[in-house]
Design a protein with these regions (language model features):
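N-terminal beta1-alpha1-beta2 module of alpha/beta enzyme domains
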Residues: 1-62, 146
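Acidic (Asp/Glu)-rich catalytic clusters
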Residues: 20-25, 47-58, 78-89, 162, ...
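Conserved, mostly hydrophobic/aromatic
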Residues: 23, 27, 50, 81, ...
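Hydrophobic faces of well-ordered beta-strands that scaffold small-molecule active sites
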Residues: 3-7, 31-33, 58-62, 89-93, ...
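An alpha-helical appendage that flanks or caps ligand/catalytic pockets
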Residues: 106-138, 183-184, 189-300, 332
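Alpha-helix-loop-beta-strand connector modules within alpha/beta enzyme cores
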Residues: 44-64, 68, 123, 190-191, ...
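Glycine-rich, proline-tolerant flexible connector loops at the mouths of alpha/beta enzymes
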Residues: 30-54, 65, 97, 172-175, ...
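Short, acidic/polar
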Residues: 11-23, 74-77, 150-163, 220, ...
């Protein structure tokens, strides 16, 4: 199993760069950031500093969206970083939650996400595409490579992943939900004539190593609220039908709106509705052996990478614990 770290690009950017360097030294192979450039600093500027400070870390957004940047700009930015640092980027992409909503945009349609993945990948790898009834190709790219990993929860999103994406990002570490979503992605890939095993599976969730579970729950409760934004969209679309497992939908019944100014932050007041059970299921907490046990269960389901959100009050200790006690047991 590979390991990644997910950070918000809060100022000062040098702290983000330092943590990414520490993560690589601890055995992490991927460095991800949020991509909402109103709520946080512009990540692609910081990626250049991260790549310069590390030797092999693969860097990218978790996740960008089709509506945040012009697609040609996105492709050229990835291609420039790859040319400078040797194909060490990856593009996580979704419909757009915080990046869209804080500027008054709705999430993109799945068809738009599909088209964006194709255009950005082709451009970043040097192929010609049709844009606005014009053939476009970036002429200076040589041997470019960019994988597109798509995030999603609902049946149609999972189908889009299986049919078109290079990787699948599940922002939730509940094994029951992982089993259902991974199965749906692989079924869609198989039906489309693709190799299901060729799609990289990444589970992303907060992780906090320690013994004080009540405190850890309070620090990680924000994640249930963040996931709840996407679940609320699913419930609006599918209702209480069996199209989406109840393990994912039942807990948002008490949800009452969401304030993006606290997005992804410990102590988010919009997440008081999230019960302890959901924090325990969606996140990894407790001492190191509990993390190893959950990760082994996810690995048995076919998870190729675990990326941990490191937004709590004991980041350095958790990072060190993963490097010394957890990663070695999953990569041996």
């Amino acid at each position: 199993m590979d390991f990644g770290i997910v950070l918000q690009t809060d100022p000062p950017a040098r702290d983000v760069v330092r943590l990414m360097k520490d993560a690589e030294d601890a055995g992490f192979r991927y460095g991800w950031t949020f991509d909402s450039c109103v709520l946080w600093q512009e990540p692609f500027v910081i990626y250049s500093a991260i790549l310069a400070a590390t030797s092999s870390l693969v860097v990218g957004p978790m996740v960008t969206s089709p509506g945040t940047r012009d697609w040609s700009v996105m492709a050229s930015t990835f291609a420039t970083l790859n040319d400078m640092y040797g194909n060490r980027t990856v593009c996580g992409i979704g419909r757009g939650d915080s990046a869209h909503r804080v500027v008054g945009k709705p999430p993109s349609t799945l068809a738009t996400v599909r088209d964006c993945m194709r255009v950005v990948k082709d451009l970043a790898e040097g192929r010609a595409v049709e844009m606005n009834e014009k053939t476009v190709q970036i002429p200076w790219i040589r041997n470019g490579r960019l994988e597109m990993w798509m995030a999603g929860y609902g049946p149609k999103a999972l189908q889009t992943v299986g049919e078109h994406a290079d990787g699948f990002i599940l922002q939730c570490a509940d094994p029951a939900i992982a089993r259902w979503t991974i199965g749906a992605v692989r079924d869609a890939a198989r039906a489309a004539g693709r190799d299901p095993g060729g799609i990289t599976i990444c589970v992303a969730a907060p992780a906090y190593v320690g013994d004080d579970r009540p405190h850890q729950r309070e620090q990680l409760r924000w994640f249930g609220g963040m996931v709840g934004n996407h679940v609320a969209d699913l419930v609006a679309r599918y209702g209480s039908s069996s199209a989406v497992p109840r393990e994912l939908t039942d807990y948002i019944r008490e949800r009452e709106g969401y304030d993006y100014s606290h997005h992804g932050k410990a102590g988010n007041p919009s997440t008081e509705f999230v019960p302890d059970e959901i924090v325990d299921r969606f996140c990894l907490l407790g001492p190191a052996p509990a993390h190893v046990e959950r990760l082994q269960e996810l690995a048995e389901l076919g998870v190729d990478q675990f990326s941990l959100y490191l937004m709590h009050d004991d980041r350095e200790a958790t990072l060190a614990s993963y490097g010394s006690q957890i990663i070695p047991k999953l990569t041996a």
